[in-house]
Amino acid sequence: MSTIDLIKNVTKREERPVYPFTAIVGQEEMKLALILNVIDPDIGGVMIMGDRGTGKSTTIRALVDLLPEIEVVTNDPFNSDPRDPDLMSDEVREKINNKQEVPTIKTKIKIVDLPLGATEDRVCGTIDIERALNEGVKAFEPGLLAKANRGILYVDEVNLLDDHLVDILLDSAASGWNTVEREGISVRHPAKFILVGSGNPEEGELRPQLLDRFGMHAEIRTVKDPDLRVKIVEERSSFDENPQVFRKAYEQSQEDVKSQIIQARKNLANVQMDRELRIKVSQICSELDVDGLRGDLVINRAAKALAAFEGRDKVLPKDILKIITLCLRHRLRKDPLESIDSGSKVESKFYEVFGLLEEN
């Protein structure tokens, strides 16, 4: 066995078990936002803001066990999809066009971490100019965006990340492609990923124009109920003492949610949303003075994803109610004189437009 294989095996054995997603108590808003983005990546990612120590990173990393498998081209640094031209590299597309055989394997969707101090080259990848000039080849060293293609890119403390890098991430997530240009040489590759950011609002907010680019915005608050706090602490202690036994207890519930997600991804295209509901969604966005049409689009997508997750082929008003705050709270203009928070404002407008009585 080679030294590299030995290191890989040791690393694999030392990998810390992940806390089960279904064992996380509370924080339903954050969990729902993550699941819906896995069902429909076109929702546009999620920004999770909340107090320190509320389980933001734990929940995001716990998602890895629920992610379905995808088919990728073997030994391809971009996780190319052998069937979708928008998700394959130029090299793979050329092989397919030339009727060459392209071997594939099944692999789990990956979560890629973007460190806070990452440089633009580390994120986007680099071109070896010397090799390009001397040998006439596009020697490209892929970055994190290549690794994240068809997966999830997680940025902790995204509000502390350089604005320029946030722009690059959002542009790539929206367009699905990353282009690197150096000294007149250009390389592009697919970079379609779900962008998940988390942060503490005390450490600074994202600029509104960047915030608007995230499909959803979840707000996480510290649990106040003493009984619930005790339960969370006890569960965490049990996991730390014996992760394998703890994970075993949640095996079935994990498998159930994973199956639900896989089925929802398959059925998503069949979910219908009545025109009347779409008109009411746009009316809410209009009356709340939401800039642009991103809000309307994301609500429609998220409502369909929720209906698919719950095993239905038709969107109901309750689906819209459940996701509308996640989709709009970060798109409202902030008025320092208003005492009502943006989430409550969105819900009140929903009840007003749909002609329903507010739930106490």
From Swiss-Prot:
Catalytic activity as recorded in UniProt: protoporphyrin IX + Mg(2+) + ATP + H2O = Mg-protoporphyrin IX + ADP + phosphate + 3 H(+)
Record SMART domains: AAA (SM00382)
UniProt GO MF annotations: ATP binding; ATP hydrolysis activity; magnesium chelatase activity
Domain of life: Eukaryota
Keyword Glycoprotein recorded: no
Subcellular location: Plastid, Chloroplast
EC supergroup of this enzyme: ligase
Activity regulation note: Redox regulation; active in reducing conditions, inactive in oxidizing conditions. Thioredoxins f and m mediate the reversible reductive activation of oxidized CHLI.
Residues reported in the UniProt entry to bind ATP: 50-57
Pfam families (UniProt xref): AAA_lid_2, Mg_chelatase
Keyword Disulfide bond: yes
Residues in coiled coil: none
Alphabetical keyword list: ATP-binding, Chlorophyll biosynthesis, Chloroplast, Disulfide bond, Ligase, Nucleotide-binding, Photosynthesis, Plastid
One cellular component term from this protein's GO annotations in UniProt: chloroplast
Entry EC number(s): 6.6.1.1
Record-level GO BP terms: chlorophyll biosynthetic process; photosynthesis
Gene3D superfamilies reported in the protein's UniProt record: Magnesium chelatase subunit I, C-Terminal domain, P-loop containing nucleotide triphosphate hydrolases
Matches recorded under InterPro entries: AAA+_ATPase (IPR003593), CHLI-like (IPR045006), ChlI/MoxR_AAA_lid (IPR041628), Mg_chelatase_ATPase-isu (IPR011775), Mg_chelatse_chII-like_cat_dom (IPR000523), P-loop_NTPase (IPR027417)
Stored NCBIfam families: BchI-ChlI
Quaternary organization: The magnesium chelatase complex is a heterotrimer consisting of subunits CHLI, CHLD and CHLH.
PANTHER family: MAGNESIUM-CHELATASE SUBUNIT CHLI, MAGNESIUM-CHELATASE SUBUNIT CHLI-2, CHLOROPLASTIC
Family listed: Belongs to the Mg-chelatase subunits D/I family.
Role summary: Involved in chlorophyll biosynthesis. Catalyzes the insertion of magnesium ion into protoporphyrin IX to yield Mg-protoporphyrin IX. The magnesium-chelatase is a complex of three subunits, CHLI, CHLD and CHLH. The reaction takes place in two steps, with an ATP-dependent activation followed by an ATP-dependent chelation step.
Protein name as catalogued: Magnesium-chelatase subunit ChlI
Organism: Mesostigma viride (Green alga)
Gene behind the chain: chlI
